């Protein structure tokens, strides 16, 4: 991962083949993640019909999202960094790890991947409407906003610790697994309340295809804010600042 550097991007970055390859990788990985994650929810609806949401279903959703994200990040990490999430890309931008141009390319690719995944799901499930995300009845909107901020903070902090930190060492080999596990764990926490989104792309595609926009803003503003906070905390409080090099003449022997 590159060192911290805030920039809009080079003039040739918009058309460079590496940018195109990275954007394609983000599109494909986001498609994989949304198809499996949202698809698992539709499958449970098909199996259990109108029965009450159970702990077993929650566990199944958590595992499906964790495994899918593990695979999606693994498949694209060496090409694009394996963001698979506009909030992660935003956090990397706030932390000075990617340029504005690269972030915009990733956002477009991630949203398109989510839309295509939701469209394919609607096609192959005989027109079942993707459910997207919403706040559960009796749960305060403000509380869910804070929950999304906190859960995405944990996700972005994990991304930094395993995939971005220059001194991460061998822990980078388990980055995709760690990222998938934190998402699965957060779904066990937040799933009964608002679905535990943490990813604007995961919310956007199903909401567009299913045309369900109620309280949709929570699943954008909360994750973006949480990722930005985690990036700032890790960049400026956790990653050590290298001291500037000292240029001096060695003391003569008689000066010791």
Swiss-Prot record:
Which sequence ranges are marked TM in the entry? 25-44, 58-77, 103-121, 144-164, 170-189, 217-239
Keywords, A to Z, come to: Membrane, Phosphoprotein, Repeat, Transmembrane, Transmembrane helix, Transport, Vacuole
User: In which tissues has expression of this protein been reported?
Assistant: Found in all seed tissues that are alive at seed maturity, but not in tissues that lose viability during seed maturation.
Maturation and modification: Phosphorylated by a tonoplast-bound calcium-dependent protein kinase.
Q: Tell me, what is an example of a GO biological process annotation in this record?
A: seed maturation
Q: Which InterPro entries match?
A: Aquaporin-like (IPR023271), Aquaporin_transptr (IPR034294), MIP (IPR000425), MIP_CS (IPR022357)
User: Where does this protein reside within or beyond the cell?
Assistant: Vacuole membrane
Q: Where is this motif: NPA 1?
A: 85-87
- Provide one Gene Ontology cellular component: vacuolar membrane
Q: Which intervals lie on the Cytoplasmic side per UniProt? A: 1-24, 78-102, 165-169, 240-256
What is the topology of this protein in the membrane according to its UniProt annotation? Multi-pass membrane protein
Family matches, as PANTHER family: AQUAPORIN TIP3-2-RELATED, AQUAPORIN-8
Quote the record's domain comment: Aquaporins contain two tandem repeats each containing three membrane-spanning domains and a pore-forming loop with the signature motif Asn-Pro-Ala (NPA).
Per the similarity annotation, which family is this? Belongs to the MIP/aquaporin (TC 1.A.8) family. TIP (TC 1.A.8.10) subfamily.
NCBIfam families documented for this protein: MIP
Q: What is this protein called?
A: Probable aquaporin TIP-type alpha
């Amino acid at each position: 991962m590159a060192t911290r550097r805030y920039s809009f991007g080079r003039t040739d970055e918009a058309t460079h083949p590496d940018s195109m390859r990275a954007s394609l990788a983000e599109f494909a990985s986001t498609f994989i993640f949304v198809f499996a994650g949202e698809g698992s929810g539709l499958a449970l609806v098909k199996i259990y019909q109108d029965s009450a949401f159970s702990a077993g279903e929650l566990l199944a959703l958590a595992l499906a999202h964790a495994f899918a994200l593990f695979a999606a990040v693994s498949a694209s990490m060496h090409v694009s960094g394996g963001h698979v999430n506009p909030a992660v890309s935003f956090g990397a931008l706030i932390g000075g790890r990617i340029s504005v141009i690269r972030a915009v390319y990733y956002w477009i690719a991630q949203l398109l991947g989510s839309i295509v995944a939701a469209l394919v799901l609607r096609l192959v499930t005989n027109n079942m409407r993707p459910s997207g995300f919403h706040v559960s009845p009796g749960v305060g909107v403000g509380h869910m906003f804070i929950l999304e901020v906190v859960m995405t903070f944990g996700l972005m902090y994990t991304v930094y610790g395993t995939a971005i930190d220059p001194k991460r060492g061998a822990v980078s080999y388990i980055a995709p697994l760690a990222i998938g596990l934190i998402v699965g764990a957060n779904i066990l926490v937040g799933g009964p309340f608002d679905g535990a989104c943490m990813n604007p792309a995961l919310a956007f595609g199903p909401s567009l295809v299913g045309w369900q926009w109620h309280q949709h803003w929570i699943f954008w503003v909360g994750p973006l804010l949480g990722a930005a906070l985690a990036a700032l905390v890790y960049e400026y409080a956790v990653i050590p600042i290298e001291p500037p090099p000292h240029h001096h003449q060695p003391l003569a022997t008689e000066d010791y």
